[in-house]
Each structure stands twice: as C-alpha cells, then as structure tokens.
Regions:
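A structural motif corresponding to the C-terminal end of an alpha-helix
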Residues: 127-136
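Conserved SGNH/GDSL esterase-like catalytic core that processes O-acyl groups on lipids
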Residues: 18-20, 26-126
Length: 136
C-alpha cells in the first residue's frame, strides 16, 4: 500500500536514496523517457545514476551483427564506475544483445568457487555479480 503526503506525493522509504542502473538499451531507456530506472527514481523520489550503454553485452568482445564492432560490456561499466560506491540500490539488466549476437550461454560454476568463463553469458554474469558482492 502506498502512502501519500498532502500534495499527493508518495511517502517512501526510498525517498532520498540513490539508485544505480547499468545494462543495455533497455536499462538506458533508448525507446522511452529515460528507462525504467528513471520511472522508479521519479516515482519514489530517488536520485538516479544511469550508466547503461545502448547495445552493451554481458559477454566481453561480442561483435554486434547489425552495427559491427563491440558496443560496450556491462561488467566493464560496473567495474569502472565511481558512482556505484554511492548507490543504495543497484539494478542490473543485460543479456538481450548477447542472445541477439549468438553469445554462448555457458554453465554455472559450483558456488562461485571455480574460474569463470567470461567468454559465455553465464560466466560473465557470475564474474560481475561476484565482483559486486566482494566490492560493494
């Protein structure tokens, strides 16, 4: 249930918090007014940092079959972000461009204990999540 103030604004425990978003064009908001992160931040009075990249992939070095070349790697954005340390909430999205460009799916490691095969979507995602858990 949402609670509103006298001006009709939602009173939320998220108000004043920082939302960090990384991902591809879906997170970037290419075909909407700033993406779902902006919708969430605006609705709940949050500060938004959106470092999503149009065309980005989970798997490094995937050649885009439409545009050619690589268009950015989500884990690289996350790893190099200075804004991430200030985030209260993190939203990550990806995999669409990997699938579109036929990146190998891969298999899960056993409990984040093995080496990650970052040439696969699964390995790249595991590595990124492990880095996030370790560093943030």
């Amino acid at each position: 249930m949402e609670v509103f103030d006298i001006n009709g604004q939602i009173i939320s425990p998220l108000a004043g918090k920082t939302l960090y978003v990384a991902g591809d064009s879906i997170a970037y908001g290419k075909s909407s007014a700033g993406g779902y992160g902006k919708c969430i931040a605006d609705k709940y009075g949050m500060t938004l940092t959106n470092e999503a990249v149009d065309g980005a992939t989970l798997t490094p070095n995937i050649t885009d079959k439409v545009y050619g070349g690589t268009r950015g790697c989500i884990s690289t954005v996350v790893t190099n972000s200075t804004a991430l340390a200030k985030a209260d909430y993190i939203l990550l999205e990806g995999g669409v461009n990997d699938a579109w460009n036929n990146a190998p799916v891969g298999t899960l490691t056993d409990g984040f204990a093995a080496a990650y095969d970052e040439t696969t979507m699964t390995g790249a995602l595991e590595k990124m999540l492990d880095d996030l858990a370790t560093n943030h």
